[in-house]
Curated annotation (Swiss-Prot):
BrlA, abaA and wetA are pivotal regulators of conidiophore development and conidium maturation. They act individually and together to regulate their own expression and that of numerous other sporulation-specific genes. Binds promoters of target genes at brlA response elements (BREs) containing the conserved sequence 5'-(C/A)(A/G)AGGG(G/A)-3'. Regulates genes involved in conidiogenesis. InterPro entries: Znf_C2H2_sf, Znf_C2H2_type. The keyword Transferase does not apply. It comes from Penicillium digitatum (strain PHI26 / CECT 20796) (Green mold). Residues 30-49 have a biased composition (Low complexity). The keyword rRNA-binding does not apply. This is C2H2 type master regulator of conidiophore development brlA. A zinc finger (C2H2-type) spans 321-345, 351-376. Residues 240-264 have a biased composition (Polar residues). Pfam families: zf-C2H2.
């Protein structure tokens, strides 16, 4: 016999064959019974003393106490699974000898409980459930606290725990309120009852539901199903993001883990979408998203149309500096640029090349520096090579002023005036630009 800690965590299914008992032989089994109409709010009490006190067994059935149990090893999740300790609860319940049963022995209930079928939803019991028996054989279970009985009315719903199926604890899933408001919900607590109206995860789009589009509940007091669910108009976001705590049944309605999930196989979601009409605000937002922006002229087109001087603003025309030399069309934005340009028209060339034998003079210093780089820093040219102006030479020294050897290397200690001719012999007219 395995430890009772492992037995309470196992899910056993009981096959009951009662050919010797009928509704007349068992007085406690004469009223109709449905797991969804159970007056107790906890999952464990669905088969405890208050809910099992009035089940209806099939008339042509017999019960055998010593019936051997069948071990099911199918890969599918256990259906109609509950704990064996729940069957032994209650005073009027038939006491079944459960001490010799193994924890994996399973017997199906769908043939003997009305309202259940092969697709019945799994009723999982939380693992934190306190263990109420003491003996390892658990011949009986401590009596559960009696809950107040409620009238078995369709509109009086007991508060059920979050471990029950969504179809049993959520009124949004239990009946289609839009198309069939007065139809009684089937007794089966399976997922197939809501396949014909539940939308898939791809069709859950944000929509505004107006009061005129939703048919109200029938008149009469309605017990709130759970604290996790409020009134139905604000119920859709909660239903979409709700994920059951049990890992065996956790199917996130918002983020399915695979392409072939129960949610992806749900059909009939088009009927659900047709019940909701897009609100004007939502429709306007969708139309604005698809509208193309109006074509505006680009900045380049505006600049090209205003490139001519006639179209320039007056403030830009005032800063135009034109060259006053006849025949020159030079225009400058700054006055210093115009002054530098005017030197090219004058005879003043104060910047003279210092290389011996070169008599080039320039009106601007930048022109002289360009002359040094392009003319005297290269070997094999028609002008004299100067090693002090060559950046690749080991004698590079742009500040050197003195005598040079025939191959262009500097003669340190010499003065530039020694080899320079008299300045009076040179005329400014002989200098090249």
């Amino acid at each position: 016999m395995r430890s009772h800690g492992q037995q309470i965590s196992d899910r056993l299914t009981v096959e009951v064959d009662c050919h010797s008992l009928g509704p007349s032989d068992c007085p406690s089994m004469t009223s109709s019974f449905s797991p969804l109409d159970s007056p107790t709010p906890t999952p464990t009490s669905l088969y405890s003393q208050s809910s099992m006190a009035s089940p209806v067994w099939h008339e042509h059935s017999h019960y055998h106490h010593g019936l051997p149990m069948e071990r099911r090893t199918s890969a599918t999740p256990l259906r109609s699974a509950f704990r064996m300790t729940d069957l032994t609860a209650g005073d009027g319940m038939m006491n079944m000898p459960c001490g010799h049963m193994d924890r994996q022995e399973q017997m199906p209930l769908p043939d003997y409980l009305p309202g259940y079928d092969d697709n019945v939803e799994q009723l999982w019991i939380p693992q934190e459930m306190p263990k109420t028996y003491q003996e390892p054989q658990f011949p009986y279970q401590a009596s559960m606290p009696q809950y107040n009985q409620m009238a078995r009315n369709y509109y009086h719903r007991p508060q059920q725990a979050g471990y029950l199926p969504e179809s049993a604890s959520n009124p949004c899933l239990s009946r289609p309120i839009f198309t069939q408001p007065m139809e009684r919900m089937p007794n089966s607590a399976s997922m197939t009852n809501m396949l014909h109206w539940m939308p898939s995860h791809e069709s859950l789009v944000p929509q505004t539901i107006t009061p005129a589009q939703v048919q109200p509940y029938p008149s009469g007091p309605v017990t709130p199903p759970s604290s996790a669910y409020s009134d139905f108009p604000t119920n859709i976001p909660t239903f979409k993001s709700h994920t059951p705590s049990t890992p065996h049944r956790s199917v996130s309605m918002g983020t399915p883990s695979g392409s072939d999930t129960p949610v992806s196989r749900i059909s009939g979601h088009n009927d659900y979408q047709e019940e909701f009409q897009l609100s004007p605000v939502y429709r306007e937002g969708m139309m604005q998203r698809h509208r193309q922006p109006s074509r505006k002229p680009s900045k380049k087109q505006l600049l090209r149309s205003n490139l001519s001087l006639e179209n320039l603003p007056s403030i830009i025309k005032q800063v135009q500096f034109k060259c006053k030399e006849p025949g020159c069309k030079g225009r400058f934005k700054r006055q210093e640029h115009l002054k530098r340009h005017m030197k090219s028209h004058s005879k003043e060339k104060p910047h003279v090349c210092w290389v011996p034998g070169c008599h080039r003079a320039f009106s601007r210093s930048d022109n002289l520096n360009a002359h040094y780089t392009k003319t005297h820093s290269k070997r094999g040219g028609r002008n004299r090579y100067v090693a002090t102006l060559d950046e690749t030479s080991q004698d590079f020294d742009p500040d050197f002023r003195g005598q040079l050897t025939p191959d262009g290397r500097p003669i340190y200690g010499s003065k530039l005036e020694d080899s320079m001719p008299d300045c009076g012999e040179l005329s400014v007219d002989g200098w090249d630009d």
